[in-house]
């Protein structure tokens, strides 16, 4: 038994399922999860001392790589001044100014402590501002675990939502409408059915929780137009894509202006953090300037602000995003080339520092229903093969992969050579 396996058995005695977030349990791929002891650059090291090239990056935040010296130094300097004050700090002001400078649609921003808190608060604000109850989300898009967001259409995209997790009252679920990602007709049908009741659309501009699905041309623009037509707000959930797809997020990359934006992951530099911001007219509706209540004991935590500021400043380096995109393209297209070489059907998607691959004969994946038809057994086999080769991918066929600036030529080469060997063994076993 490895030390990771022993720790997992020990953890299951005191922690539900042995983990503090379900995907970490490896249920999607089988086997026992790795327990991580440390990380540096492009590598993580498990409890048994084995190194892995990491394409999870703490699920997105580590865009500069693990244990980046500028972030580490900023955190250590902040720690000397105290861990939390429960009062305003200059760091919060600096972070707000940095976010606003990088994302043109954001005129004011409120810091919180998680992505879930950000989306939950943005939706409450949208409901309060519009005085409407219903929200519209998309099948396969994840926006955190707030009750109103853990909802999926029960018998099709145009039906009232049904709870997708026990513990969510149907009275909550009925206000959440679910449309089909990359399908404007499904959105218009809902607006025509509830023309004055929908407060907002919330969307992952690049869906990263059904693997990696970019928007088709015109989709985000169509959502913006429909929100304007029916008086709803457009919330772009950039918890995952913010400052990862481009310096101004996915909204900057695709040229779409939302009313509200949610952020997280990258803006914390690896610390727990979230934020929501947007038009001043809307943001002024939040307490203490407006009637919509939102608060948080650790919001704007000085350690998180210090880490986030250090990372955000580093991301302003000229040419960084072009280099990151080139690395991502090389990995995604390299996986596809290796699969083609061995006669294993595969489709790929990638944008900025995000990528996805699908074991499927479908040429292009643009919707959630297509993702569910992909070969999960092939993914599991590939996953464990790559893990044995020292490459750590997301342990689920429904999660995106992430590159960092710490992934260099050697890491990319080693990863693609490993993929070639694993896919070759898979073909030989078929």
Swiss-Prot record:
Enzyme class: isomerase
GO cellular component, one term: cytoplasm
Compartment list: Cytoplasm
Pathway connected to this protein: Porphyrin-containing compound metabolism; protoporphyrin-IX biosynthesis; 5-aminolevulinate from L-glutamyl-tRNA(Glu): step 2/2
Keywords annotated in UniProt: Cytoplasm, Isomerase, Porphyrin biosynthesis, Pyridoxal phosphate
Chief location bin: cytoplasm
Gene Ontology terms for molecular function: glutamate-1-semialdehyde 2,1-aminomutase activity; pyridoxal phosphate binding; transaminase activity
Classification via Pfam families: Aminotran_3
Keyword field contains Zinc: no
Gene Ontology terms: biological process: protoporphyrinogen IX biosynthetic process
Modified positions (N6-(pyridoxal phosphate)lysine) in chain numbering: 265
PROSITE patterns (alphabetical): AA_TRANSFER_CLASS_3 (PS00600)
EC number(s) on file: 5.4.3.8
InterPro entries referenced in this protein's UniProt entry, alphabetically: 4pyrrol_synth_GluAld_NH2Trfase (IPR004639), Aminotrans_3 (IPR005814), Aminotrans_3_PPA_site (IPR049704), PyrdxlP-dep_Trfase (IPR015424), PyrdxlP-dep_Trfase_major (IPR015421), PyrdxlP-dep_Trfase_small (IPR015422)
Co-factor requirement: pyridoxal 5'-phosphate
Catalyzed reactions: (S)-4-amino-5-oxopentanoate = 5-aminolevulinate
Domain of life: Bacteria
Quaternary state and interactors: Homodimer.
Protein family according to the UniProt entry: Belongs to the class-III pyridoxal-phosphate-dependent aminotransferase family. HemL subfamily.
HAMAP family from the UniProt entry: HemL_aminotrans_3
Designated name of the protein: Glutamate-1-semialdehyde 2,1-aminomutase
Record organism: Shewanella sp. (strain ANA-3)
